[in-house]
Curated annotation (Swiss-Prot):
Protein name: Cysteine protease YopT
Organism the protein comes from: Yersinia pseudotuberculosis serotype I (strain IP32953)
Residues at the active site: 139, 258, 274
InterPro entries: Papain-like_cys_pep_sf, Peptidase_C58, Peptidase_C58_Yopt
Enzyme class, broadest EC rank: hydrolase
Length: 322
């Protein structure tokens, strides 16, 4: 069975369920070029205990929400337990091992960590793992909310956490992030279009430039595997003579895809957000370019073709608040 959700690809095989289940085999959980192969033979009783513990972990426990319902009466989204949630937890764990290396490298290139955040671990993972459409990650929705918050002169993390500190979640923001991801995962729906519609409702618009006497959105695509990072970084750092711009960046490879975001300002530098690592700031574009090229690309594992190291798409946005 092949399944692709969010930015992870998982292949599950040789799994059968029933009262006489004696073994379970998980094969080829792929993240980046790291192929995680876990083959486990379990007795019936041991398997029951492990699955029961996993189900309980996903369906119970302290809520860590500031209130049970959103301000308009909606409950935090969740779906029935699925076996893929176990695999997603494993993949998130692999990604989370890269967090220290990425964060430690920021200062070495003259950058600062604005906020430590990772969807791959901790309380936030515990919230998104409870729904089949968000269990693999909510990078697209997080980037969209980050751009909106920054354009409003606010911090996504002040809106996501009570008091802006990790602990309790603001359920309205958590619900909004999860719902945008869920809406983009529906059948026969283009996730990019869903995000664009959400942006329009929140005062964010695609930047338009004139080409051949027509106004067209700034939409740059290319490859990283054969052409290196110069084309990608040029697209991220180009402000088209305006001096600033919001960037939503899609990275993809043979089996995975991921979204990151940035605010580029010719005067104040680059503020960069990756849902897997947090928010960082570099005082000028050259510092960011060197960090991204010499450190981040490899430390994040994004350089592998099996992961997200083949293609990119960079969209530029404007906001009336800027």
């Amino acid at each position: 069975m092949n399944s692709i959700h969010g930015h992870y690809h998982i292949q599950l095989s040789n799994y059968s369920a029933g009262e006489n289940l004696q073994s379970a085999t998980l094969t080829e959980g792929v993240i980046g070029a790291h192929r995680v192969k876990v083959e486990t033979a379990l007795s019936h009783s041991n398997l029951q205990k492990k699955l029961s513990a996993t189900i309980k972990h996903n369906q119970s426990g302290r809520s860590m929400l500031d209130r049970k319902l959103t301000s308009d009466g909606k409950a935090n989204q969740r779906s029935s337990f699925t076996f893929s949630m176990i695999m997603y937890r494993m993949i998130h764990f692999v990604l989370s091992t890269r967090v220290p290396a990425v964060r430690e490298s920021v200062a070495n290139y003259g950058g600062n960590i604005n906020f430590k955040f990772a969807q791959t671990k901790g309380a936030f993972l515990h919230k998104i793992i409870k729904h089949s459409d968000t269990a693999s990650g909510v990078c697209e929705a997080l980037c969209a909310h980050w751009i909106r918050s920054h354009a409003q002169g606010q911090s996504l993390f002040d809106q996501l956490y009570v008091g802006g500190r990790k602990g309790k979640f603001q359920i309205d923001t958590l619900y909004s992030i999860k719902q945008l991801q869920i809406d983009g995962c529906k059948a026969d729906v283009d996730q990019d279009e869903v995000t664009l519609d959400w942006f329009k409702k929140n005062g964010i618009s695609e930047r338009m430039i004139e080409r051949h006497c027509l106004l067209r959105p700034v939409d740059v695509t290319g490859t990283t595997e054969s052409e290196g990072l110069d084309q990608l970084l040029n697209a991220i750092l180009d402000t088209h003579g305006i001096g600033y711009g919001y960037k939503k960046i899609h990275l993809s490879g043979q089996m995975s895809a991921h979204a990151i975001a940035a605010y580029v300002n010719e005067k104040s530098g680059v503020t960069f957000f990756d849902p897997n690592f947090g928010e960082f700031h570099f005082s000028d574009k050259e510092k960011f370019r060197k960090w991204f090229t010499n450190s981040f690309w490899d430390n994040s594992m994004y350089h592998y073709p099996l992961g997200v190291g083949q293609r990119f798409r960079v969209l530029t946005f404007d906001s009336k608040e800027v």
